[in-house]
Regions:
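Extended, low-hydrophobicity, polar/charged segments
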Residues: 1-153
Length: 153
């Protein structure tokens, strides 16, 4: 299988990861977890939002959970946040819906991952392309992006 830009970044930074591949017709996070036989608590989805200040933020939550917009707003000191429209995702991040990764976005955005990720040695999330996931230590994300961990679900 080809490597994605996310995988190349991880290779360049010498960060250990395990790639996972699945049928690229699957875009639902729970289906991805089931297909890969992974615990859905350890498989994360990447969500892009906009705050009342018009700043964009990235939130990374387990696929079996929903982002709590109030908790998310508090985590980034915003009055409120809302999800961006799907059609804005590609121009803003360089990724499409179902293939959005917290690593390698067009611009660096403040990113918050649900604190439950820290309960696990390894978590899995999109490698930047539908059909590709990377499994890695959540603490290693700090070496790559501006990320904090907070209760956002």
């Amino acid at each position: 299988m080809d490597k994605t830009n996310v995988m190349r970044v991880l290779d360049q930074k010498k960060i250990k990861y395990t790639p996972h591949y699945y049928d690229n017709t699957i875009t639902n996070g729970m289906e991805v977890a089931n297909t890969l036989n992974l615990d859905p608590n350890k498989v994360f989805k990447t969500l892009v939002t906009i705050g009342a200040s018009k700043r964009n933020y990235v939130f990374v939550v387990p696929v079996n959970s929903e982002l709590d917009l109030k908790k998310a707003a508090i985590a980034v000191n915003e009055k409120s946040i809302e999800m961006i429209k799907s059609k804005e995702l590609l121009d803003l991040t360089g990724y499409i819906h179902g293939g959005c990764s917290p690593i390698g976005m067009k611009k660096p955005f403040r990113t918050v991952m649900n604190e439950s990720a820290l309960n696990y040695e390894l978590v899995t999330f999109s490698a930047g392309k539908i059909g590709y996931q990377v499994e890695m230590n959540p603490n290693d994300l700090k070496k790559l992006i501006n990320i904090t961990f907070s209760l956002i679900i």
